[in-house]
Every structure is written in C-alpha cells, then in structure tokens.
Amino acid sequence: MQGQTQSISFDGREIRLTTGRFAPQAGGSVLVECGDTAVLVTATRSGGREGIDFLPLICDYEERLYAAGRIPGSYQRREGRPPERATLTARLIDRPMRPLFPAWLRDDLQVVATCLSLDERVPADVLAVTGASIATLLAGIPFNGPMAAVRVGLLGDDFVLNPSYREIERGDLDLIVAGTPDGVVMVEAGGNQLPEQDVIEAIDFGYEAICELIKAQEQLLKDLGIEQVKPETPTQDTTVPAYLEKQCTKAISEVLKKFDQTKDERDKALDAIKAEAAEAIAGLKEDDAIRVATASNSKLLGNSFKALTKTLMRQQILKDGKRVDGRALDEVRAISALAGVLPRRVHGSGLFQRGLTQVLSTATLGTPSDAQEMDDLHPSTEKLYLHHYNFPPYSVGETRPMRSPGRREIGHGALAERAILPVLPAKDTFPYVVRVVSEVLSSNGSTSMGSVCGSTLSLMDAGVPLKAPVSGAAMGLIKEGDDIRILTDIQGIEDFLGDMDFKVAGSEKGITALQMDMKITGLPVKTIAEAINQARPARLHILEKMLEAIDTPREGLSPHAPRLLSFRIDPELIGTVIGPGGRTIKGITERTNTKIDIEDSGIVTIASHDGAAADEAQKIIEGLTRKVNEGEVFSGSITRIIPIGAFVEILPGKEGMIHISQLSEARVEKVEDVVKVGDEVTVRVREIDNRGRINLTLRGVPQSGDGAGEEPQPTPVAPLS
C-alpha cells in the first residue's frame, strides 16, 4: 500500500499528511498526524438530488476508544451513539466547510473524520477540521478553500497555539478559529470573562497561523500534481428573476418599510405578493418562457422571490440604515425578564423575552452522584454543570414530530453551557451538580443567547452564588463588496438573509463565550473586532434589564432542593467509612435517610432534605474517622454484651470493648451484674491493640453522679480548602 507523506513544520511541531494509502475508494482521504494523535478524514461526493434547494452536506466525527487504549464500558463493549463532544466536533467541521461550497451545488457530500489515535498533548478536533479541507480538495469537489483551523489558548499573558488538554484546562481562553485566504470563516470560544481586546488579539494570532496551514495545503496539491477545482457558477435562466424584480420590487419594498407590523403580518404580506406573482405567471401563455421555466422547476419562483426579498432588505439596511422592524443598526429589541416564574418545587426558574424570542429556563440542584459520566476520548470524565436546550415546533408556529435532540439543539445547549461555566462557584464552596433546561417557547432569532440570559435568571433564582451574571447578544452582518453594516440583536429574517451570525456572551467584566458562523468565504479580523466591540453595549443593556428582575442570587435555596454538607477526612480512612462490602456507609445512609458521596481526595458530601439528619450522618463519619488515643475518657452507651465483656459506642459509629476484668475493681462473675444494654457509662481508653481494636476500662473512672468529668470534645474536622 503505497502512499505519500508530507511533513509541515508548524509552531515547533511536525504535522504529517499521508495521502494515497488509506480509504482508496473515498473521493479524497488524508491521515493527519501530530504527536501521537492521528485522524483519518475522508470526503466523498455522490450524484445530485432532484428537487432540493439546499446543499446535502453531512459531516461526521467518529471516536474510537481504542485511540486511547480503552475498551468501551457498554454492555456490548462497542461504541454506540456518538457522545455529545463528538457531535460538537462534527458541527465544528461542518460550520466552516458549508459556506465554502458553491450555492448551486446539490450533490450529496459527506466528510467523515475518525480519530484513530489520541495524544493528550494534541487535541484531535482542529486537525479534523483542517483535514476536512484537504480531503475535499483531493476529492476534486468544487470548494472555495483551502481552509484550516487552529486552537488558541491563553496562559498568563501569553497566547499558546494548539494547547494541550491540560493547558486548555489551566488557561483563561479556549478559542478555535477557522479561516480561508479571504479571512476568518468560523470562531468558537470560551473565555474566563476576558476583555474584548484580548479575544480580538487571540483571533488575529490564530489567523496568522492559519495562513501558514493554507500555504501548506496549496503546496501539497502542487506536489501531488492536483489542480484545485474552483466553483464556477453555471449559467442560470434570468427571465423569472427579472420578471419578479419588475413586478414585485415596489410591493416588497413597501412591506419591508412598514416598521410597525409584526413578524406574522410581514410574512403574510410577503406570501400574498408571491401568490399574486404566481397567479400572474399562471395566466401567461403556455409557451411563455417565464411560465415554462416555473413549470419545469417548482422551486424557481420561490427561490427567486426569496432572493429578491433578500436583496431589497439588504439594500434598505445599506442605504437607509433601517431594519425591517425600524430599529437602528445598533438597537436591541424590547426586553422582558422575570425570575421565579414557577413554584419553588422547581429549584429555580427564569423567563426571558427579547422581541418575539422567549425562553423559559429552569435550574435543578443535585448531588455529586448526579454528575454526568463522560465515556469518550476527552480526559475529563464528568460534568458538574449541564445545560439542555429544547426547541419544540410550536416555538415557530409549526407542527412536526417531537424527537430526541438533534445536532442543532446539542450545539445551542453547549454554547449556553459554555457561557455560564466561568462564573459558576467553585466546587468546594458550592458542591451541587446543577442542571439547567432552556425551553424555547417562541423563536425569532438568537434563542441560544436567550438561553444564556434565561440560565442566569434561573440560577440566581435557585440561589446559586454566581461570580457574575451573564447575558448574550447575537450580531449580524450585511456585506456588499466593501460596504459593510454590523447589526445588533438580529432577528430571524436578518439571520436568514444576512451574511453572519455572531453570538457573544459575557459578564460586565468580559467575554465568556463566542460563536461566529459565516455565509461568505471569510471576514477580516478588523471587521470581527468591530462586531465584538459593538456587542458589548448591547450585552450590558440586556444585563441591566435582567438585573431589574433579580439583582443578586437568592440567599436561601428552595425547600425542595437537597441540603449538602461537605467536609474532609483522611483519604486513608475512606475504607473505614465504606466498610466491608459497603455495609458501614449503607448503614449510615439508611439510619439517617441521607445520600453520601466520598471522593478519592477524602471530600465527603452528605445530601439530605433534613438538616438534622445530615448533621447526624456527619457526626457518625467524624466518629468513625476520629483518631482515638490511649488515656482518653469518653461517655457512651452499652450497645451489646458478650460473655467476656461489653461493647460501648464511644463515638458515633465507633465501639470499644470493656473486658469483664475491667468492669470493676472487684471480681465480676457475670457482665450483666455490672452493666446492661443501654446503660450510660464513662470509660477510659486502656489500650489500642495491634489490630486497631479499642480496649476500654471502667476501673478508676468516676461515673456520672459521682464526680465524673465532662466528655472530651471530638477533634474538629479540617475544613475544606
């Protein structure tokens, strides 16, 4: 199996590209390697579909646990449905690829990236994105590439190119940027409340590196003797577009300038104009070119009408500076925010509305055992904060079957989750697992940013001590040549007919999440910087409205939320608390009706709806793990009697034995002659034998009522730090 391997020196590392060896029947394939990470990426094209008006592109990212030397934990020991992070990586490949294919292309396209080996120093996702571009170029598919992606981290004051998983976790920024020779085409980022300027500089830093990878791809094609297939727009019939422009321009323009109408009224007015045009065309002669063209292509009229509407709306924005709802370019829609809209059985709730977009978010507090276990290639194995996003059909006035979340729902949920993560309290101060669910009740653009705002409201209502409240806004863009307008808080039609969807979330201090998608082949960093800076006053305006509903997290939790107690024990004593076969900890939970989690570090978390029960469980565990010294005096009750002695519970869950010879100074024939089960006695620790058993004595120890002293207080347990 012959193949060619090209090496690229990139930021002090070697990236190896192997072509012609793997997947010979795929349209194009490349194995991208860096360190011990290896990703096989293929691109395949099949015949075109009739009667569709979209690009049927599928991008898949496949993880194989053998890549990390692991066997799946499922019953069948086989990978099943792609985990969430794999789905997000598939979207990461799709988003910069999709705008680079020609608008007329209707062939089935599929890009599959498979992670074959994973080095924790080299995450596979950005290699997969770059590999998708190479495989597509090798397949001879019309494509406005090359395209490449890099990750940028921030450690201290220094940007790090393609950081390791550990560096990502330690840093204040995790930014992925993809670009073409025309500019940046995709941005995805999470930041620790970073100033706008830091994020802009990171994007610029990343794009400079992207340009190196683009040159490397061009050189690869040259070395392989492959000529890139550039998209050429086929000749299209202009009779129908010209007819609609003549017949409908005035009517459409009048509708777009009725700023006081609702979305529904505008949509119905445009539909009426289109229906009138269709009726007029149907009245033309049977051999008329316009009638023949629309009859042979059922989607031609609709697509041409949509294109005309798009052109007129864009012209209105570029020339008049007015949007379809009359807002200025930097104006935010009317905002409404409420906290605590549901009964307190729901731990926290918030209702956020911006224009016609409405999101209901709920927050639920759980125990450490509620954390989500992640069975994928990522080094982190659990999630303590989860955000789930639901988009039912009624939110856009439609009907369709209700199914499990798709890629869009997963992606939007992950973005809103990432926006909140940097402001969540530390685990040792707030040990709850938190789940937020955002229900989109009405959608007219920017539902993901509405979910960010709703999440903040619900978390504050639940009493989660956020470091700072977070809001978000979606920015848009209209570009005709060098004429550019940036739009604040875009609504549905502006997203659909515009060139960019740029979501920015953050606190007053700085940015926590970014996501930018383009419909054009790239933007200069300068324009992206303008959009980021224009988003800040919008975010702060939205945040101000939210804080009118709730300005600080509630002091008390819902009475229906679990109460958690956390403290630390010696990790070497974890086995003592658990007991043989888990008997000890099971007995504590049954006795106190609590839920107990113990981490390997020795952190114990007790969950209960009854504070007294949690306190009791803590005392038992502290008793089990408290060190007992010879000579200490304790008061306790007789728990059981055997022929040779009696057992005393000297601390919660911890017993010692009084040998019959230690019950009295005088000779004792029968244990029951001195003590009975339930008697309260004061004992001294006589010795602790080499098996850890505690031997007690009553001899020489004053009992209550005859001058006995107070029981020594247990040694305090070290607080969490």
From Swiss-Prot:
GO molecular function, one term: magnesium ion binding
Ranges for region Disordered: 698-721
Broad EC category: transferase
Keyword terms, alphabetized: Cytoplasm, Magnesium, Metal-binding, Nucleotidyltransferase, RNA-binding, Transferase
EC number: 2.7.7.8
Cross-referenced Pfam families: KH_1 (PF00013), PNPase (PF03726), RNase_PH (PF01138), RNase_PH_C (PF03725), S1 (PF00575)
Cofactors: Mg(2+)
A biological process term (GO) from this entry: mRNA catabolic process
Domain of life, per lineage: Bacteria
Main localization of the protein described in the UniProt heading: cytoplasm
Subcellular localization(s) per the UniProt record: Cytoplasm
Catalytic function, reaction form: RNA(n+1) + phosphate = RNA(n) + a ribonucleoside 5'-diphosphate
Residues involved in Mg(2+) binding: D495, D501
S1 motif domain segment(s): 631-699
A cellular component term, taken from the record's GO annotations: cytosol
Domain KH: 562-621
Function of the molecule: Involved in mRNA degradation. Catalyzes the phosphorolysis of single-stranded polyribonucleotides processively in the 3'- to 5'-direction.
Annotated family: Belongs to the polyribonucleotide nucleotidyltransferase family.
Name recorded for this polypeptide: Polyribonucleotide nucleotidyltransferase
